[in-house]
Amino acid sequence: LETDILDVLDQNELAKFNRELLAKGAAIYAESIKVVIFKSGSGKLSFFEDGEEFIIYHLQKDNISIVDDVCVLEILEDSEIYSIDADDMGELLKNERFAKAYADTLVNISLLQRQIIKSILFESAKGRIANFLVELAAEQNLMQNGYHYVFLPFSLKVLSSFVGLKRQSASTAFNELIKDDIIR
């Protein structure tokens, strides 16, 4: 979720957060629920299970996320973040604009979880990839010659993780979408 959350906090409120400068490749693991705000840089929030990675989403400047003990936040480029344990947020929630941004994040996380569950339960591999690309196109809003196009700043392996498929299944489905002229 992109937000202007750092702009709504005064210096006293911002001082309640841990400010961290993290190098590319660093990882954040949380023993309890932690709220992380990116001031600069980028990262990805992932689950790992049986040696497989499932990327929940990519994060960048002005994104807020929640990290818990079942996921990891990997830093993809040098980043400046602010983090705080969820248990220490009581005073911050008195700031109405901060509380709204935080609530919006919780709502978006809930909606994302439902979309993931729905796609895992009900959609074919082609449907998962097509729906992911449609959602990404809507978010990026890139147009050329009257057509939407999508910038994929990641590999097919990462795409397969986003849609909950093995790389080979994602590759096959992606090629079928091209063959069926659904994507070009």
Predicted stretch roles:
Residues L1-A23, Q60-S65:
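Cyclic nucleotide-binding regulatory module and flanking cytosolic helices
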Residues E53-L111, Q115:
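Cyclic-nucleotide recognition modules
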Residues L21-D78:
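Cyclic nucleotide-binding regulatory domains
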Residues V35, E80-Y82, F151:
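A residue-level structural signature of the nucleotidyltransferase/glycosyltransferase Rossmann-like core
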